[in-house]
């Protein structure tokens, strides 16, 4: 082990547990909770603006559906995108949520389903819902990556950069990129700033959702180069995460082009 790099302590992933059980509050779960609290605060603030088109009750319904979408989609996505072999050997693994395991791409699919349902039940244009939701997401994503860092999981590849860190649960105790912190900064703070600056200017409907897909996809694709892959690469070229980001980038670019071609639907 190289003593020139920061050796992280063993963080306890649990804030507290009930007796000898695995049931309790974990730092990762707290990050999700704080992300939703912040999202509601920001959403209610925007809903209370004149001519927002939203009421607080509608926002609460949307966020509840979104929470369920993130939880169910994130868990199912983690199992089927990254742990399918484990699931096939032990199907009940899907329900052992206390062991952790959430996928952003699965959570995104869950949120899209939640937005479709909310738009239908509120008789609202889907893109109006998507544009409202997109700027609420990045801050929570950043907090989720902080949770990954505390859990000492999803670390980066070996490196010799001055800020490399040694994770105590790494069997090889190698200096690695703190890729969780890179993602927290890019997917969290930077993307949050980009989207919330973008919505202050006139823009066509659906453009905010498209920009979110492009922004997240590009940032995640970049960080994957320094993140230790969870599963095998595709054709030895790109990681599973990068493969899942490509449709986001392409889809986001298509949505942006389509949105700007509809010049009549400009939101001020």
Swiss-Prot record:
Localisation: Cell inner membrane
Gene Ontology BP terms: lipoprotein biosynthetic process
Keywords attached to this entry: Cell inner membrane, Cell membrane, Membrane, Transferase, Transmembrane, Transmembrane helix
Recorded GO MF terms: phosphatidylglycerol-prolipoprotein diacylglyceryl transferase activity
Name of this protein: Phosphatidylglycerol--prolipoprotein diacylglyceryl transferase
Cellular component GO terms, alphabetical: plasma membrane
Topology class, membrane: Multi-pass membrane protein
Stored Pfam families: LGT (PF01790)
Role: Catalyzes the transfer of the diacylglyceryl group from phosphatidylglycerol to the sulfhydryl group of the N-terminal cysteine of a prolipoprotein, the first step in the formation of mature lipoproteins.
Listed transmembrane segments: 23-43, 62-82, 97-117, 132-152, 179-199, 206-226, 241-261
HAMAP family: Lgt
Keyword Cytoplasm: no
Binding site for a 1,2-diacyl-sn-glycero-3-phospho-(1'-sn-glycerol): 145
Family to which the UniProt record says this protein belongs: Belongs to the Lgt family.
The protein's enzyme class: transferase
InterPro entries tied to this protein: Lgt (IPR001640)
Gene source species: Haemophilus influenzae (strain PittEE)
Disulphide-bonded residues: none
Pathway(s) of this molecule: Protein modification; lipoprotein biosynthesis (diacylglyceryl transfer)
